[in-house]
Amino acid sequence: MSASTVSITANTAAATRRTPILAGEKKSNFDYPQSESLANGGVGEAGGTSRDLSRGEATLDRSQGQDLGPVTRRSVSAATGTNTTATQRRTRKVATPKSEKARWKTVVRIFAKQLGALLIIVGLIQLTRKMILKASSPSSPISSYETEMAFSGLESRIAEVDGLVKATTNSMQVQVELLDKKMEREAKVLRQEIERKASAFQSELKKIESRTESLEKSVDEVNAKPWVTKDELERIYEELKKGNVDDSAFSEISIDELRAYARDIMEKEIEKHAADGLGRVDYALASGGAFVMEHSDPYLVGKGSSWFATTMRRAHTNAVKMLSPSFGEPGQCFPLKGSEGYVQIRLRGPIIPEAFTLEHVAKSVAYDRSSAPKDCRVSGSLQGPESSAETENMQLLTEFTYDLDRSNAQTFNILESSSSGLIDTVRLDFTSNHGSDSHTCIYRFRVHGRAPDPVPVVGTNLDQDSSPESE
């Protein structure tokens, strides 16, 4: 719908609104006859005609009027000066029914108003639509300006938000850096404190370890070299009891006699330790009947490096040095190749094992002690008369580490968990030494224990059963 249509419609509505005004013009209910009009000089007719011509109205049909009877009008003539009496017939116009005319006019008026309002609303909607289309069109200068203004406002807000975010980020970064520096300082102080306490703790621990090692050495030396055993004390006590001396006689013993007795005991102990160094029975002594069954590869250098020296027992002839006293002389040992190896020994007889002693050259006379074994393991079994080298039935007896800071002859007791019975074969395994890659030397290996108690033979009834048959 165009603008011209809207304007034309509006004019039509205005004309429609003016229609009731023209139709509702009030006219006189009295109609004068023609003679009266002529008597009045034709003024009324002329006036009526003039009115009808100016307003474009049609003359009303007077035949519809109602005759109300004659009406007498008096008029004075100015020319003659006489009174003229004219009889005029008065008629009343029959009125149309107002209710019907008002109803259809009201309906038309309401319809026209509604139609006009509808047309106006439609026109406004069309105009608004065109304005929106023009605003959304990119070619419109007004819409582009508004868009630029909107974008500029949006960019300014985005810039403000960006600046706020950057400021917040910078402040947070500063706070984080300060916190990191503070934590780093505290961590550094804490680390220094921990290191200081750790160093102090390590120093104290080293002191405790040194004291423990010295105490262990003292205990081992005391255990390894007992001057007077319990059996000897009991024997001395028995000898004193056999002397048949009473308290008075004992009180009369002189100091010289006590010194002589003590000297006698000391000489016996010295002789005993000079003979073997420990004062304990060695069941792996070669001169007592023990021998080496087999061993790992020997380390032989020089003329005697041939394997022809190996006997039928798969042991070298010089392996007997491991079961013989070396008397502390350097070089009186049997070297085995590498840092790992083993030696299997047949004892002089079945025993109940108690301890084992591994001996190396003394520190005071040694040239190099790096060939001494370090981590060792001892196992044993009872094989009987058959001399076999099987290790399947071997039972672990003890594990130990040979320490170069202790005495050259170190004794190790069997494990408490190993409830071993009789054994006649012992195997020594070493898995490392104290630094030598070429060989490991064993000066002497001893086995301590006690022989089993002899079982008394109890008489049976075999002789009694066989006596009647002999008869």
From Swiss-Prot:
GO cellular component, as recorded: cytoskeleton; endoplasmic reticulum; endoplasmic reticulum membrane; nuclear envelope; nuclear inner membrane; phragmoplast
N-acetylserine: residues bearing it: 2
Topology term for the membrane: Single-pass type II membrane protein
Coiled coil feature spans = 175-225
GO function term, MF aspect, one: protein-membrane adaptor activity
Q: Where is this motif: Nuclear localization signal?
A: 88-95
Q: What is the effect of changing residue 439 to A?
A: Strongly affects binding to SINE1, SINE2, SINE3 and SINE4
Fetch the InterPro entries from UniProt.
SUN1-5 (IPR045119), SUN_dom (IPR012919)
* Domain SUN: from-to ranges: 288-452
Outline the segment boundaries, as ranges, of region: Disordered.
Answer: 19-98
Tell me the compartments it is located in.
Nucleus inner membrane; Cytoplasm, Cytoskeleton, Phragmoplast; Endoplasmic reticulum membrane; Nucleus envelope
Q: Where is the composition biased (Low complexity)?
A: 78-88
Which segments does the topology annotation call Perinuclear space?
A: 129-471
Q: What happens when the gene is disrupted?
A: No visible phenotype. When associated with SUN2 disruption, abnormal nuclear shape, rounded instead of elongated, in some cells (e.g. mature root hairs) but also numerous meiotic defects namely a delay in the progression of meiosis, absence of full synapsis and a reduction in the mean cell chiasma frequency.
Q: Which UniProt keywords apply?
A: Acetylation, Coiled coil, Cytoplasm, Cytoskeleton, Endoplasmic reticulum, Membrane, Nucleus, Phosphoprotein, Signal-anchor, Transmembrane, Transmembrane helix
- What processes does the entry annotate via GO biological process terms? meiotic attachment of telomere to nuclear envelope; nucleus organization; protein heterooligomerization; protein homooligomerization; protein localization to nuclear envelope; regulation of establishment or maintenance of cell polarity regulating cell shape
List the transmembrane segments. Answer: 106-128
What tissues express this gene product? Answer: Expressed in roots, hypocotyls, cotyledons and leaves and inflorescences.
- One Pfam match: Sad1_UNC
User: What's written under domain?
Assistant: The SUN domain may play a role in nuclear anchoring and/or migration. The SUN domain is required for interactions with WIP proteins.
Summarize subunit and interaction data from the UniProt record for this chain: Forms homomers (e.g. dimers, trimers and tetramers) and heteromers with SUN2. Interacts with SUN3, SUN4 and TIK. Core component of the LINC complex which is composed of inner nuclear membrane SUN domain-containing proteins coupled to outer nuclear membrane WIP and WIT proteins. The LINC complex also involves nucleoskeletal proteins CRWN/LINC and possibly KAKU4 and the cytoskeletal myosin KAKU1. Interacts with LINC1, WIP1, WIP2 and WIP3 at the nuclear envelope (NE). Interacts with SINE1, SINE2, SINE3 and SINE4. Interacts with NEAP1, NEA2 and NEAP3.
The role this protein plays is: Component of SUN-protein-containing multivariate complexes also called LINC complexes which link the nucleoskeleton and cytoskeleton by providing versatile outer nuclear membrane attachment sites for cytoskeletal filaments. Required for the maintenance and/or formation of polarized nuclear shape in root hairs. Modulates the anchoring and mobility of WIP proteins and RANGAP1 in the nuclear envelope (NE). In association with SUN2, may be involved in telomere attachment to nuclear envelope in the prophase of meiosis.
PANTHER family linked to this entry = KLAROID PROTEIN-RELATED (PTHR12911:SF8), SAD1/UNC-84-LIKE PROTEIN-RELATED (PTHR12911)
Q: What is this protein called?
A: SUN domain-containing protein 1
From which source organism is this entry? Arabidopsis thaliana (Mouse-ear cress)
Q: Gene encoding this chain?
A: SUN1
